[in-house]
A protein has these predicted regions:
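Short, hydrophobic/aliphatic alpha-helical segments
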Residues: 2-21, 141
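Conserved phosphate/anionic-ligand binding catalytic regions in large, soluble enzymes, centered on
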Residues: 16-39, 142-161
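Amphipathic alpha-helix face/heptad-repeat signature
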Residues: 29-33, 61, 68-71, 75, ...
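Transmembrane signal-anchor/signal-peptide helices with a preference for the extracytoplasmic
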Residues: 40-52
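A structural-propensity feature for long, helix-poor, extended segments
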Residues: 49-89, 188, 195
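Register-specific recognition of a single heptad position within extended alpha-helical repeats
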Residues: 52, 56-59, 63-66, 98, ...
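Amphipathic alpha-helical interface segments
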Residues: 79, 83-152, 156, 168
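Preference for long, well-ordered alpha-helical segments
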Residues: 124, 128-131, 135, 142-205, ...
Length: 211
């Protein structure tokens, strides 16, 4: 009941007019859900004689997926804090030239910092998708659909986090930072799309959907 209450409270806050939590936290949560689903497939595989040949590897996947999930949960909070820093910077006084200059420096620094959580979400979820693709191949076949769900959620998390990065990029004045961020976003999105497609091909084959 306590867990249900916390989830309900988060969803209530997400759906409210409050600025946080927002898309950044939701993206990280989607990634955490993907990691949890992939872990479930692994948990249902370990200890089964049919999959004894991959048992040790599956146990490693469980540990890594759990670490990824925990990291993504932390990034939910990090994203909220980063947004609050941006908001605070925009509220700084701008009555004089000195104040405006100081405010601009603070805003640019906060925007740069605000890109870090969603970029970390993208990196962590791409790693999660790599693990998901593997468990889809070697895990219990009857829960392959759950691995597919994890892959779909994971790609959605990456694409959503990309928007949160780009929302800050368009306000940055540092051209090198803009260039680097755009390159990272494009790379992560391409990687996520490739992993999702490969995982889904495996899932469809194991579910007998290609017949």
């Amino acid at each position: 009941m306590a867990d249900e209450t916390r989830l309900a409270a988060f969803l209530e806050a997400l759906g409210s007019s409050a600025p946080t939590p927002g898309g950044g936290a939701a993206s990280a949560l989607a990634g955490a859900l993907a990691a949890s689903l992939a872990e479930m497939v692994a948990q249902l595989t370990v200890g089964r004689p049919k999959y004894s040949a991959v048992d040790e590897r599956v146990r490693e996947l469980i540990a890594r997926l759990r670490e990824a999930r925990d990291r993504l949960v932390q990034l939910m909070a990090d994203d909220e804090r980063a947004f609050q820093e941006v908001s605070a910077a925009y509220k700084l006084p701008k009555g004089s030239d000195d104040e405006r200059a100081a405010r601009e420096v603070a805003v640019q620094a906060a925007l740069l910092n605000a890109m870090r959580p969603p970029l970390a979400v993208m990196a962590t979820v791409c790693y999660t998708l790599t693990l998901t693709e593997e468990i889809a191949r070697i895990g219990k076949g009857t829960v392959a659909s759950d691995a597919g769900c994890a892959a779909i959620l994971g790609e959605a998390a990456v694409r959503s986090a990309a928007l949160n990065v780009l929302a800050n990029v368009v306000l940055l004045r540092d051209e090198q930072a803009v260039h680097d961020a755009r390159q990272q976003v494009a790379s992560f999105e391409a990687r996520a799309a490739d992993l999702q497609q490969r995982t889904m091909a495996t899932v469809r084959q194991r579910m007998g959907l290609n017949q």
